[in-house]
Each structure stands twice: as C-alpha cells, then as structure tokens.
Swiss-Prot record:
Pfam families: Peptidase_C48. InterPro entries: Papain-like_cys_pep_sf, Peptidase_C48_C, VPRT. Its EC number is 3.4.22.-. It comes from African swine fever virus (isolate Pig/Kenya/KEN-50/1950). The active site is at H168, N187, C232 (nucleophile). One of its GO terms (cellular component) is virion component. Substrate binds at Q226. Keywords: Host cytoplasm, Host-virus interaction, Hydrolase, Inhibition of host innate immune response by virus, Late protein, Protease, Thiol protease, Viral immunoevasion, Virion. Belongs to the peptidase C63 family. Coiled coil: none annotated. This is SUMO-1 cysteine protease S273R. It comes from the Viruses.
Amino acid sequence: MSILEKITSSPSECAEHITNKDSCLSKKIQKELTSFLQKKETLGCDSESCVITHPAVKAYAQQKGLDLSKELETRFKAPGPRNNTGLLTNFNIDETLQRWAIKYTKFFNCPFSMMDFERIHYKFNQVDMVKVYKGEELQYVEGKAVKRPCNTFGCVLNTDFSTGTGKHWVAIFVDMRGDCWSIEYFNSAGNSPPGPVIRWMERVKQQLLKIHHTVKTLAVTNIRHQRSQTECGPYSLFYIRARLDNVSYTHFISTRITDEEMYKFRTHLFRIA
C-alpha cells in the first residue's frame, strides 16, 4: 500500500473540507459564472481555479460584486509547485496549514518559523500549549482570528536563521489526543533536532505536564527518508497531515517514504498557480 493511501487527501484542486468534488465553487458563484464555466476551454482553461483567475472573469465578477478571492482562499487548495519540484516557500506552507485547519477543527495551525525563534518574535515561540488545548490561544482560520480548543498543533520550521534565505524544512507536531501526549520533531533528512528545538520541546512538555499526566518528546529522525534536494517542504507537510489522519509516528520510524511519493503528494497539496 502506498503511504498516500493512508491519508484522506486527494489530487482534487478543491480544499479538503469541500465534500462536493464535482465543483469547488459555492452554488452562488457557480450560478453567476455558468456561461464562463461552460466555455472554459475557450478561455484557455482546464480547471475552475483557472477560470476564476482569468482577467475577463475577474472583470465580470467585479462588476457584479462577486468575491472571487474569498472563493480561492477558502474553497481551493493553495497555489504552489504542484507539477514540478520547485522549492516550497513559507507562503506555500502556511496557506496549506490554514486550509487544513478548516477541515480539522481541533488543529492549531502555527505560522512558519526560522531557527532563531528564541531571539526573533515568531508566533511559534510565543504559543502557550495549555492555552492551545483549552481554546485560549488565537489562531487564524478562514482569514479570521479565532479561539477554539485544539488537541493537535503543527508548525513547519526552517533550519536557517531569519537573516538567510532558507535551508531545510522540518516539522513539529504536538499530539494531545489519547492517554500519552507527544511533542514530535520530524526531519526528512534524518538529522537530530538542534538546540533551540530541544529547548522548545522541553518547555512545552513542562507546560503540558501541568494538565496531563504523561507527555513525551520524540525525535522522529532515525531514517533518512529524503534523498533529493527539493522535497523537505512536502515531507514536512506530509508528516503533519499523516499525523492528523492518525498515522502513527512509528510508521516514519519503521518505513522509508520515498521522494517519488512526495512528488505525487504535491498534487494533493496544491492547485496549479
């Protein structure tokens, strides 16, 4: 079985929470844009996202007072390098996690962080995990600041400092489900967590031990999954997605996930920009 079969995502360009995969658009927008959708080939399009970003359609929507930007932001996957091995940006990553937070209503999506988060004021280093669990920590879902109880937390970090252009993406996942809670670090290259991450994990562990009896820290790094120079972003997002779908962290310890599977996973992550 392919690892992709263990998760609930699909190559559809619709956002994960859209159940009607025949169309990603709301019924109102479908109705208003029927004539454009029926002749999308004449616009040079083969997808709904292409249609609603076409200049002629955008001009028509503006005249009609239709908010197509909201459709793109909430009903479609994020734009990104879907059919190539382009490096993922922080926008690709954060926009994907924001969309997953719509589908997984107990997931706290934390904006990306660089590795000097102890010195720079990144959200990652300011989060109180007890407040996350109790629904007292602000997060952004569908463009709105909300507070809601969350039993999972995910963030993608870059191993470079904020003065650099980026080196390697890694994932943090906090699982506050079940009897034993865990604070997990995943690195597709198999490298151990650096000092700032170790200190962050220990600090969060002490926070959570105030409200739960068993909390452990895990470095899921015993296998070098990644062999390419491009897939650290997809691997990091895949780890978070797999854990949200209840794939155990032990799977990443016992089974190598290939770069080829991450090439395919890109079609699950993004719509064509």
